C-alpha cells in the first residue's frame, strides 16, 4: 500500500514536469513565430516521452578526473529534494499536514543548494564550478527575501501551517493587501529557480551549460526534472500564499481545479518572461536584491508587525 501511495504521489508530478517542458517549447516557439515540437505524436504531445526514452537509454558518461561518489549523488539529491517539497502543500489536502509546513519548505529549498555545489565541484571543470558558485550565491541571497516575505505572510496568517492560509483568504486574496510582497516574491522565485532573466548559472555565452556541463543522459535528466519540479512548486506556493486556493469549502474538486489553473497561469508567465527579457548582469542581480528588495521587504515586515498591535487586532489563529 505504501508503494502505491508513493507512486500516486510521484508519477503525477513527473508527468506535470514532462508536459511543462513541452509547453515551454511550444510557448517559446509561438512567441518566436515558429511551431515548436510537432512531429512526435499528435501536435507533438509525445515529445517529452521521446526525450525521456532518449536520455535514459544513453550511456551516462563521467569525466575521468571527477569525484565519482559526489558526481552520482548530486542529481539524485536534487530530484529527491524537488519531489519532497510537495509533501506539505495543501491542494486542497496535503500528503502530510505539518504544523511547520512553511519552515519545512524553506529548509528543503536551502538544502537544494548542496546538490548544485556538489555537482559543480565533483565535475572537476572550471565552467561547472563557476556556474555552481554563481547558483549558490544567487540562491542563498534570494532566500533571504523569500524568508522575510514568508514571515510577513505568517504574521497576517497567525500560523506556520499552510492549510490555515486557505481559511485566511476565504473572503479576500492576500495579493490585494500585500501586492508589493507578492511582486517581490514572484521575482525572487524566478531568481531562486535560476530562470531567465536570472539564469546566470547557465550563461551559455560564458559557461557552456553551467553546473551540469559534464552531465549526460540519466543524471542530466534528473537535474532537468528537479529544475522544472521546483518551478511548478514555487508557482504552487505563490498560489497558496497570495491567490487563495479555495472557492467553496464544500466543493473540493472545484478547489483543486482552481488551484491547478492559477498555478498553470503563473507558470506560463514564467515562460513568457523567458521569451521577453534578456539576461541580467551579475552585479545588477545582486544590486536588485541587497539594495532594493531587502530594505522594502524589511519595511513591509515591520509594517505587518505594527499594524495588528496598533489596531488592537490579532491574527485569526492566535
UniProtKB/Swiss-Prot annotation:
EC number: 7.1.1.2
GO biological process: mitochondrial electron transport, NADH to ubiquinone; mitochondrial respiratory chain complex I assembly
Catalytic activity: a ubiquinone + NADH + 5 H(+)(in) = a ubiquinol + NAD(+) + 4 H(+)(out)
EC class (word): translocase
Pfam families: NADHdh
Keyword Plastid on entry: no
PROSITE patterns recorded: COMPLEX1_ND1_1 (PS00667), COMPLEX1_ND1_2 (PS00668)
Membrane topology value: Multi-pass membrane protein
Single GO term (MF): NADH dehydrogenase (ubiquinone) activity
Keyword Mitochondrion annotated: yes
Transmembrane feature ranges: 3-23, 68-88, 102-122, 146-166, 172-192, 223-243, 253-273, 294-314
Cellular compartments per GO CC: mitochondrial inner membrane
Subcellular location: Mitochondrion inner membrane
Assigned keywords, A-Z: Electron transport, Membrane, Mitochondrion, Mitochondrion inner membrane, NAD, Respiratory chain, Translocase, Transmembrane, Transmembrane helix, Transport, Ubiquinone
HAMAP family: NDH1_NuoH
Function: Core subunit of the mitochondrial membrane respiratory chain NADH dehydrogenase (Complex I) which catalyzes electron transfer from NADH through the respiratory chain, using ubiquinone as an electron acceptor. Essential for the catalytic activity and assembly of complex I.
Subunit field text: Core subunit of respiratory chain NADH dehydrogenase (Complex I) which is composed of 45 different subunits.
Protein name (Swiss-Prot/TrEMBL): NADH-ubiquinone oxidoreductase chain 1
Amino acid at each position: 500500500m505504501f508503494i502505491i501511495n508513493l507512486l500516486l504521489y510521484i508519477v503525477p508530478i513527473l508527468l506535470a514536469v514532462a508536459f511543462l517542458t513541452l509547453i515551454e517549447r511550444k510557448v517559446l516557439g509561438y512567441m518566436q513565430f515558429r511551431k515548436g515540437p510537432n512531429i512526435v505524436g499528435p501536435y507533438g504531445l509525445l515529445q517529452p516521452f521521446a526525450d525521456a526514452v532518449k536520455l535514459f537509454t544513453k550511456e551516462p558518461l563521467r569525466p575521468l578526473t571527477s569525484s565519482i561518489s559526489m558526481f552520482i549523488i548530486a542529481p539524485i539529491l536534487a530530484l529527491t529534494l524537488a519531489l519532497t517539497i510537495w509533501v506539505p502543500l495543501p491542494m486542497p489536502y496535503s500528503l502530510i499536514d505539518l504544523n511547520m509546513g512553511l519552515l519545512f519548505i524553506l529548509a528543503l529549498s536551502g538544502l537544494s543548494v548542496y546538490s548544485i555545489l556538489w555537482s559543480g565541484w565533483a565535475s572537476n571543470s572550471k565552467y561547472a564550478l563557476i556556474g555552481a558558485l554563481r547558483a549558490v550565491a544567487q540562491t542563498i541571497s534570494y532566500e533571504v527575501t523569500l524568508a522575510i516575505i514568508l514571515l510577513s505572510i505568517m504574521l497576517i496568517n497567525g500560523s506556520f501551517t499552510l492549510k490555515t492560509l486557505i481559511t485566511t483568504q476565504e473572503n479576500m486574496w492576500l495579493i490585494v493587501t500585500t501586492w508589493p510582497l507578492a511582486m517581490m516574491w514572484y521575482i525572487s522565485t524566478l531568481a531562486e529557480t535560476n530562470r531567465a532573466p536570472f539564469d546566470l548559472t547557465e550563461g551559455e555565452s560564458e559557461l557552456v551549460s553551467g553546473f551540469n556541463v559534464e552531465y549526460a543522459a540519466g543524471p542530466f535528466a534528473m537535474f532537468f526534472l528537479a529544475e522544472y519540479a521546483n518551478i511548478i512548486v514555487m508557482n504552487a506556493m505563490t498560489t497558496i500564499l497570495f491567490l487563495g486556493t479555495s472557492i467553496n469549502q464544500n466543493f473540493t474538486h472545484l478547489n483543486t481545479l482552481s488551484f491547478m489553473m492559477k498555478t498553470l497561469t503563473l507558470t506560463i508567465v514564467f515562460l513568457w518572461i523567458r521569451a521577453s527579457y534578456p539576461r541580467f548582469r551579475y552585479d545588477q542581480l545582486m544590486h536588485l536584491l541587497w539594495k532594493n528588495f531587502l530594505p522594502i521587504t524589511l519595511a513591509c515586515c515591520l509594517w505587518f508587525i505594527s499594524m495588528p498591535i496598533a489596531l488592537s487586532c490579532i491574527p485569526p489563529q492566535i
